[in-house]
């Protein structure tokens, strides 16, 4: 199952949870959508991120979309028509990738991660700075996104 499909399924599940139509029980308490899905955005409204926990092989992952101006363009990327831009994807222990994306995690209502603040969840850490967004996983792999510089590490 691709990460994109998993993300689409997770978004649908969160919508159902919000409507009270879906409940996922654990041994002693009910999991909430906050445990399985979270979103945040940069104050510039140019980077939007989604954290997803699923039962797929990509059990926990983070995806961030840069809406415009990624530099340099990831080498060899020729996105197909209809692509909305470049995303940064990473699972909890692997290396980050910069795939082309035909969907987006854009959500203007997502929590704003103010400059100088850090977001942590499920083995991921993201630091918001005026210079851009830096996210890493448990293996210390990650990515940096900004209009001026974007890279994986």
Could you describe each region identified by the protein language model?
Residues 43-72:
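Short, surface-exposed binding/anchoring microloops in extracellular/periplasmic proteins
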Residues 9-18:
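Bacterial N-terminal signal peptides
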Residues 29-31, 61-113, 145-153:
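A low-complexity, Ser/Thr/Gly/Pro-enriched, surface-exposed linker/loop concept
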Residues 17-32:
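C-terminal region of N-terminal signal peptides and the immediate post-cleavage residues
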Residues 101-134:
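Acidic, glycine-rich flexible loop segments
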Residues 35-46, 116-121, 125:
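Extracellular glycan-recognition/adhesion modules and their associated mucin-like linkers
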Residues 127-153:
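Extracellular glycan/ECM-engagement signal in secreted proteins
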Residues 1-9:
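Bacterial N-terminal signal peptides that target proteins for export
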């Amino acid at each position: 199952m691709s990460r994109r499909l998993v993300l689409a399924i997770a978004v649908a599940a969160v919508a159902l949870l919000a409507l009270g139509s879906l409940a996922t029980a654990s041994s002693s308490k009910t999991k909430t959508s906050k445990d399985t899905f979270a979103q945040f955005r940069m104050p510039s409204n140019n980077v939007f991120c989604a954290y997803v926990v699923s039962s797929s092989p990509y059990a926990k992952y983070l995806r961030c979309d840069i809406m415009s101006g990624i530099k340099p363009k990831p080498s060899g990327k020729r996105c197909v028509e209809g692509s909305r831009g470049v995303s940064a994807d990473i699972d909890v222990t692997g290396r980050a990738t910069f795939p082309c994306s035909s969907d987006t995690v854009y959500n203007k209502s997502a929590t704003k991660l103010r400059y100088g603040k850090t977001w942590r969840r499920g083995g991921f850490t993201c630091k918001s700075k005026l210079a851009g967004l830096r996210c890493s996983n448990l293996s210390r792999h990650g990515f940096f996104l900004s209009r001026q510089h974007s890279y994986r590490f």
